[in-house]
Structure formats: C-alpha cells, structure tokens
C-alpha cells in the first residue's frame, strides 16, 4: 500500500524507530526485518502488545490483521527512509577502518588525534563509543564491532546534534557483508591487516577478503566535479556547487561546498575518497589491483609502502618510529609499544592529513596519543600485558614483539584460550604459535559459549605437539598461576579478551576482566599500582 512516512510519524505521534523486539518502546515504529538468525515478523504480536505506534513489514504471508500493521514492498527501504527523516544528521567527516586486527586501535588513534588538534571527535567500534572534547553522550550501545544501520545512525545523529564533526568507526567483515552500514559514505577508508579469522562465517579466506573490500567499493565517496554556482549566497560570493554521482543509484547530488564543508575540505571532496592500506598485508597486490579496477585511489603504509617505515627502536615502555614521507625522513616517539602499531599510527595520521590537516602537526601530536584499553596494555609497573590477540596473526605479532624486547635470560609466558562457537580451524594453529614463541604456555578458557571448553582446550593443545604447557580451565586461576611463576624480568602476556569485561559460558555472561584480575592479584602481592 502507498505510504507517507512523515505523515505517519505525525499521525501516530512516533517517538522512535526499532528493529529489536527486546528493546522496542511505546510509540516506536517497529520494522519487522528478517535477519541472519532471527525474523522480526515472528515478534509482531509481541510488539503490538507493547503499545508500539506502528509495525512495518514486507512479509505478505503474515495473517495479522491490525490497523497498526502496514505492508510495504521492501521493509529495508522503508527503514532507510525513516532513518533519513528521524535521524538525518551525522558528523561531516567520516573515516571507516577495516582489518583483521588493528581496527579498534586505529579508530581510537584517529579520534584522539582530532581531539588533540582541538576538534570534537568520536570513535565507534569493538570497545564502544569513545567521545573526545565533550561529555560522553551515548548509552546502551549494542555490543557489535559494526552496529546495525539504525543504531549507527542514532549515534551519529546524537553526535552531530552535539557539534561533533569528526567520527572514526570500525567496519567488520560481518557488518560489511550484511550491509549494516547502509548508504553511509566516508572520506577515507583504512585497511589495517588481513589474516585468517571468521572462517566459520565466510568459509574461505577469499570470501573473507572480498567482504572487507566492500568497504572501498560501497562506502568510499566517488570523485566529484565542480559546477559553477549562479547567484550570490550569504556564505560566499565565490561558492560553487559540488556534483557527485552516486555509483549505486546513478543519481547525482549537489552540495553547496564552501557553505557546508569549508575550504579545507574542498579538494578531497572533489577528488573522491582515499583508501589507506597496510603494505605488509600478504595479499596487498591483489588488493591494489582490485582497487585500481574500481578506479579507487589508494596509498600504502609499511615497510614497502608509499609511506615507508624504515626503522623502529622499541622497548617494553616506548618506541621510536622512523619513516619516509614525500621523500623526507621523519620520526616520532610513542608510548604505544609493538612495531605493528607503527603502521596503525601512520594510517591514522594519513587519514586525518587527507582531510586537510597539516601532516607535521599531526606527527607532533602522535607522541601524545595513548594506548587503547586491552591492546598491548601494560598493567601498572609490571611486565604483564593484556591484549585482545584472538587470531593467529595477532597472537604471533604480540608474542614476537615481547620476545624481541625481553632481556636475554628472561622468560616469555602466555595465558590464552579460544572462543567457543567461532572459527575452529585457528585453535591448533594458535597453540602451535604459542609453543614456538613463548617459553611457558598456559591454556585456559575464553568465552566457551555453548561448546565444551575441555574440547576447545584439546584442539589448542593438538597444535602444541611436544612443547611443555599447563592446562588450567579456570581463567582467573590460570592468570594467578602465570603471575606466581614469574621470575625477575620475566614477561607475561594474557591474550584473547583484551578490553572485554565478561566471560560467556553457555547463555550466561559473567563479569570478568583480565586487567582487573591482574591488578587485584598484584595488589595483594604489593607489586603493582592498582
């Protein structure tokens, strides 16, 4: 049936939009969307009993007869239309980051750097919503790396309403594959790393990579061209119209450029978006060819990148990073450890520079950027680190970094497990990596969910072969064992959970925080600051 959403909003006094029957509120419009695992149409009767204003569905098989139920051709299209009416605003400058590892770090570095440049900025991702330059405005954020499109636009609208102009956010392969970013377009898109993960969902590494690449083909701004503006405006007598073709629809949009974005943003809008890639990705040549075939501009960062990292001097407390930019040797110091963080920091710097900020100023500011919670996070004044490394590549990088900076006669210890109901093929590989790089391996549980944790541990142990290991199911006891066996100058890495403050066992989500456990145990020993 024909419908006019604006009129429906007014007629039914709509207060909000919802796609989740568990969180729908009185006077919301509920959009009954069929998802990967759950069908919103199964909950129509339930939400009608919760005094929703309307239900919109495209399932013609529904037999529900109710004045509040409206049938449309495409419920997803109706939702997008409603979002544009209800949550039309978003920060003007958007940066998206994808990659197997490094997403959370890069979006945080971007938002922190903007803030240090005097701008109000925010980041969205695995850790949640971080806001810099004003009070935290966001509550009740769903726990997904990439939010559903409605949640994302609600948050983006809230940020824009509070004058936040700069937003960096994570784009996961699941989110990209499921089109959770809707029609969002970004100024720069970053690719931090690529290695095995999520094969339980994507099945093959090729599918996983192609899902990542959707960020660049679907969501990067396409190049635009100038069109003379006829007539004066209150903003500028030299203003002109920006004309941009939307590749997905073939339509064009016109924006009064200087009035809306300011002169600083002119050139990148005319040029289109930029892809910033880690040159150390094994599949980098495939990625570059793919982007060339789609006429997407890119720049690479890394040991063999356009921005070339030439030397890194690191310790347990800091590192000095040397690189070449525009044929000029540059360097900066950072308290963020791990050589892989060098490319993450420079990717963040380039994404901001592309929008128009001075590169030298950005590099000066990078020295003030702080580590991200649960990302090679050093606990107090100890040699104990908590890291989110839950993939083979991330675990290998974390252990390699610590092995390279430890004293010759000291030992490197690791506590880790693997998540249940996730990619099983990586478990033995992670066991193999731990046994090869660490002197002491402690296998424990990490969000077993609905799998038998003993079987998960056995799969990890199958990769260890003849190396020594200790198996302790209880994660707190495993951490305690690791701490108690540390000798002078030894290092302990607690891997897999990072920032997480829970342990998922079956359907229960129990409080658990690796860093807090360490602080508690070390405080009892009197050897760390709480």
Curated annotation (Swiss-Prot):
Protein residues bound to ATP: 99-105
Q: Which GO terms describe its molecular function?
A: ATP binding; magnesium ion binding; UDP-N-acetylmuramoylalanyl-D-glutamate-2,6-diaminopimelate ligase activity
Q: Which residues form the RPE1 insert domain?
A: 221-269
Q: Which residues bind UDP-N-acetyl-alpha-D-muramoyl-L-alanyl-D-glutamate?
A: 21, 145-146, 172, 178, 180
Q: Which UniProt keywords apply?
A: ATP-binding, Cell cycle, Cell division, Cell shape, Cell wall biogenesis/degradation, Cytoplasm, Ligase, Magnesium, Nucleotide-binding, Peptidoglycan synthesis
Pathway, according to UniProt?
A: Cell wall biogenesis; peptidoglycan biosynthesis
GO CC annotation: cytoplasm
- Motif: Meso-diaminopimelate recognition motif; annotated at 446-449
Q: Where does meso-2,6-diaminopimelate bind?
A: 422, 446-449, 496, 500
Q: Which Pfam families match?
A: Mur_ligase, Mur_ligase_C, Mur_ligase_M
What catalytic activity does the UniProt entry give for this protein? UDP-N-acetyl-alpha-D-muramoyl-L-alanyl-D-glutamate + meso-2,6-diaminopimelate + ATP = UDP-N-acetyl-alpha-D-muramoyl-L-alanyl-gamma-D-glutamyl-meso-2,6-diaminopimelate + ADP + phosphate + H(+)
**What EC class does the entry list?**
ligase
Q: Which residues carry this modification: N6-carboxylysine?
A: 212
Q: Which EC number applies?
A: 6.3.2.13
Q: What InterPro entries is this protein classified in? A: Mur-like_cat_sf, Mur_ligase_C, Mur_ligase_C_dom_sf, Mur_ligase_cen, Mur_ligase_N, MurE/MurF_N, RPE1, UDP-N-AcMur-Glu-dNH2Pim_ligase
**PTM per UniProt?**
Carboxylation is probably crucial for Mg(2+) binding and, consequently, for the gamma-phosphate positioning of ATP.
- Tell me its cofactors: Mg(2+)
Domain of life, source organism = Bacteria
A Gene Ontology BP annotation from the UniProt entry: regulation of cell shape
Q: Which family does it belong to?
A: Belongs to the MurCDEF family. MurE subfamily.
**What is the role of the protein in this entry?**
Catalyzes the addition of meso-diaminopimelic acid to the nucleotide precursor UDP-N-acetylmuramoyl-L-alanyl-D-glutamate (UMAG) in the biosynthesis of bacterial cell-wall peptidoglycan.
Q: What HAMAP family does its record include? A: MurE (MF_00208)
The name of this protein is: UDP-N-acetylmuramoyl-L-alanyl-D-glutamate--2,6-diaminopimelate ligase
Please give the organism. Rickettsia felis (strain ATCC VR-1525 / URRWXCal2) (Rickettsia azadi)
Q: What is the lineage of its organism?
A: Bacteria, Pseudomonadati, Pseudomonadota, Alphaproteobacteria, Rickettsiales
Q: Which gene encodes it?
A: murE
């Amino acid at each position: 049936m024909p419908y006019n959403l604006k009129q429906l909003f007014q007629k039914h006094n709509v207060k909000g939009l919802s796609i989740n029957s568990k969180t729908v509120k009185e006077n919301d419009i509920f959009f009954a969307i069929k998802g990967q695992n759950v069908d919103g149409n199964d909950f129509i009767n339930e939400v009608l009993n919760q005094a929703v204003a309307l239900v919109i569905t495209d399932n013609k098989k529904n037999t529900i007869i109710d004045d509040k139920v409206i049938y449309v051709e495409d419920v997803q299209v109706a939702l997008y239309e409603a979002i544009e009416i209800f949550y039309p605003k978003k920060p003007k400058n958007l940066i998206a980051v994808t990659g197997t590892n490094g997403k959370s770090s890069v979006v945080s570095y971007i938002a922190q750097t903007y803030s240090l440049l005097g701008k109000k900025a925010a980041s969205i991702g695995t850790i949640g919503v971080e806001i810099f330059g004003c009070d935290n405005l966001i509550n009740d954020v769903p726990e997904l790396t990439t939010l559903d499109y409605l949640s994302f636009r609600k948050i983006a609208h809230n940020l824009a309403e509070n004058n936040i102009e700069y937003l960096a956010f994570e784009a996961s392969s699941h989110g990209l594959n499921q089109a959770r970013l809707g029609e969002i377009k970004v100024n720069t898109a970053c690719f931090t790393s690529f290695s095995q993960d999520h094969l339980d969902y994507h099945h093959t590494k090729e599918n996983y990579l192609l899902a990542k690449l959707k960020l660049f083909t679907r969501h990067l701004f396409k190049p635009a061209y100038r069109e003379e503006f006829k007539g004066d405006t209150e903003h500028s007598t030299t203003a002109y119209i920006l004309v941009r073709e939307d590749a997905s629809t073939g339509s064009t949009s016109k924006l009064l450029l200087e009035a809306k974005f300011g002169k600083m943003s002119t050139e990148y809008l005319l040029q289109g978006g930029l892809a910033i890639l880690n040159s150390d990705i094994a599949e980098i040549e495939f990625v570059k060819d793919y982007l060339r075939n789609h006429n997407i501009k890119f720049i690479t960062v890394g040991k063999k990148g356009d921005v070339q990292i030439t030397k890194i001097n690191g310790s347990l407390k800091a590192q000095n990073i040397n690189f070449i930019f525009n044929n000029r040797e540059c360097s900066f110091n950072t308290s963020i450890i791990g050589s892989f963080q060098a490319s993450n920091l420079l990717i963040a710097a380039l994404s901001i520079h592309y929008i128009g900020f001075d590169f030298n100023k950005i590099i000066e500011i990078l020295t003030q950027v702080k580590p991200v919670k649960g990302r090679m996070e050093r606990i107090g004044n100890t040699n104990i680190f908590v890291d989110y490394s839950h993939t083979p590549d991330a675990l290998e990088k974390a252990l390699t970094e610590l092995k390279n900076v430890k004293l010759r006669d000291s030992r490197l210890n690791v506590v880790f497990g693997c998540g249940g109901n996730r990619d099983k093929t990586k478990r033995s590989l992670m066991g193999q990596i731990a046994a090869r790089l660490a002197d002491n391996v402690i296998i424990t549980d990490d969000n077993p969910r609905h799998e038998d944790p003993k079987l998960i541990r056995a799969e990890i142990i199958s990769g260890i072969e003849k190396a020594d290991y200790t198996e302790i199911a209880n994660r707190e006891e495993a951490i305690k064992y690791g701490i108690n066996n540390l000798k002078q100058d030894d290092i302990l890495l607690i891997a897999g959970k990072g920032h997480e403050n829970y342990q998922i066992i079956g359907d229960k989500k129990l409080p658990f925080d690796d860093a807090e456990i360490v602080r508690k145990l070390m405080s009892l020993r009197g050897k760390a600051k709480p």
